[in-house]
Design a protein with these regions (language model features):
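Bacterial N-terminal signal peptides
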Residues: 1-10
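Mature catalytic domains of secreted/periplasmic carbohydrate-active enzymes
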Residues: 16-433, 442-458, 469-480, 485-486
Length: 488
């Protein structure tokens, strides 16, 4: 299909200081001529709706955001004094000696996750209780005050070494809410928290993702609260390691809005939701929040004053709780399959929590379930029934492309992918099959695609040909992959 050439009338707007113009895209492939691409942010100014739609199509991720999206599977490790006290939120009064993982083996954590296909492991270096899993200089509420390894242990360092050993990326969760710090609620606490960020980003090598929770104590009556200095925290992170993506209360990755393991029917990465650290009243859309069902449709764009490349992360635990509890069991394989379709298959990255037990090991049942999950993914998404489906192609609104399908091969999953290095553009799609070359049957339709869209069919099918129609798109749609798979 011929590439459409689109020539834009100038639109008054302010964008990020990094953009791509004159046919030089982030992928190095030919794209629309004379096109300006906005990286991560664009101010819509006084643009009309059609101009906003066009600008949304030219909003693209940073290289770090793009890499993050391609990981697809990431793992959370909730591990601290709560593992022994049985609490989900510790209160900061714990005796450090309660932390005593006699068989701690971070190699087991990382090896298990690597074998299951995960690309990053995220450790709760500090949860709300304030207990630090590294020998911080900022507080005595840490592993250095425990009897574990005679106070010389360092969980973060152990995990760093395991990640290096197995080729896994390291992420760190650091709670700004600290129920142990006596200075919490005062300006001195901001200094303390920045010092903790600095230690983590200077002592432990490259960190790929930093996860900042938004809880501050306001939900518990009588608990001190704090107004977090998010711009200062984010500056500290980016000054120390510019490539780090910051999640949830950061400005690179947003919380999907639930802990049920599912994305939206229309999951946009270019959204009008302002990232938490920015705090710019001029670009806030009234009523729009992380839990809103729609963050980027044309209806939202009509009210938007700015747009952000702010992709979704789906965080969910393999058990009912985030921390280990002996009376809980891992979710079934069928449930994990559903979560995969609703997260990775809905233009999001899955952050699956697997909590170590009091030994310091991932529980045997969880290890078995992760192995089953990884095997299912590999077996399901290895053999694409579409012939030539992995080639890049473009389509304007209403245009289609047909593909041959491996004869006689069953499939029950449709996969579509956009080249999001050039933005997210598809607003409505339809997928049809034919067995005789003339009678077409619709088997899937939807709104957004993004990095990856998976549609599970009710019944396995065979076909001679497949047709993908981009019914509506913002500028020219850039498809990178079309697939039909059989998932048991």
């Amino acid at each position: 299909m011929l590439l459409m050439l689109v020539f834009m009338a100038p639109v008054s707007c302010a964008a990020s200081d990094k953009f791509y113009a004159d046919n030089v895209p982030p992928t190095g492939n030919p794209i629309e001529e004379n096109t300006e691409y906005f990286e991560k942010f664009v101010d819509l100014g006084s643009a009309t709706l059609e101009e906003k739609v066009d600008m949304a199509a030219r909003l693209i991720p940073t290289p770090a955001q793009l890499e993050w999206q391609r990981w697809e599977l990431t793992a959370f490790i909730h591990f601290t004094v709560n593992t022994w006290t049985g609490q989900e939120w510790g209160d900061g009064t714990e005796n450090p000696d309660v932390f005593n993982p006699g068989e701690l083996d971070t190699d087991q954590w990382v090896r298990t996750l690597k074998d299951a296909g995960f690309k990053l492991v995220m450790l709760t270096a500090k949860h709300h209780d304030g207990f630090c899993l590294w020998p911080t200089k900022t507080t005595s509420h840490s592993v250095a005050s425990s009897s574990w390894k005679d106070g010389k242990g360092d969980v973060v360092q152990m995990l760093r070494e395991s990640c290096d050993k197995y080729g896994m990326k390291l992420g760190l969760y650091v709670s700004p809410w600290d129920r142990n710090a006596s200075c919490y609620g005062t300006p001195e606490y901001d200094d303390m928290f920045v010092a903790q960020i600095t230690e983590l980003l200077t002592w432990y090598g490259d960190v790929a993702e930093m996860w900042f929770d938004g809880a501050n104590g306001s939900s518990i009556p009588g608990t001190p609260t704090h107004t977090f200095d998010w711009p200062r925290y984010m500056k500290a992170v980016k000054d120390l390691q510019p490539h780090v993506v910051t999640a949830i209360m950061g400005d690179d990755i947003r919380w999907v809005g639930n802990e049920a393991g599912r994305g939206r029917e229309q999951e946009w990465s270019s959204v009008a939701l302002q990232p938490a650290p920015l705090k710019n009243p001029a670009t806030v859309v009234s009523g729009l929040e992380a839990k809103s069902a729609d963050l980027g449709s044309r209806d939202v764009l009509s009210r938007a004053k700015a747009l952000y490349w702010y992709p979704a992360e789906v965080d969910v635990s393999i058990r009912n709780g985030w921390f280990y509890h002996a009376d809980q069991q891992p979710k079934s394989l069928e449930t994990l399959k559903q979560i995969y379709f609703a997260s990775v298959g809905s233009n999001a990255v899955l952050l699956l929590n697997i909590p170590p037990d009091t030994r310091g090991l991932l529980p045997d049942a969880d290890v078995q379930r992760l192995g089953e999950f990884g095997t299912w993914i590999r077996e399901s998404f290895t053999d694409n029934r579409v012939i030539g489906g992995d080639g890049a192609w473009q389509a304007a609104s209403g245009k289609s492309r047909e593909f041959d399908v491996q004869p006689g091969q069953l499939f029950n999953v449709v996969m579509l992918q956009e080249d999001i290095a050039r933005g997210q553009r598809v607003e409505r799609f339809r997928v049809e099959i034919t067995s005789d070359g003339s009678t077409w049957e619709t088997i899937a339709q939807g709104i957004t695609i993004g990095h990856k869209r998976l549609v599970k069919l009710d019944t396995p099918r065979t076909a001679r040909n497949l047709r993908v129609t981009i019914e509506q798109t913002r500028r020219t749609a850039n498809l990178s992959n079309v697939g039909l798979y059989y998932a048991k």
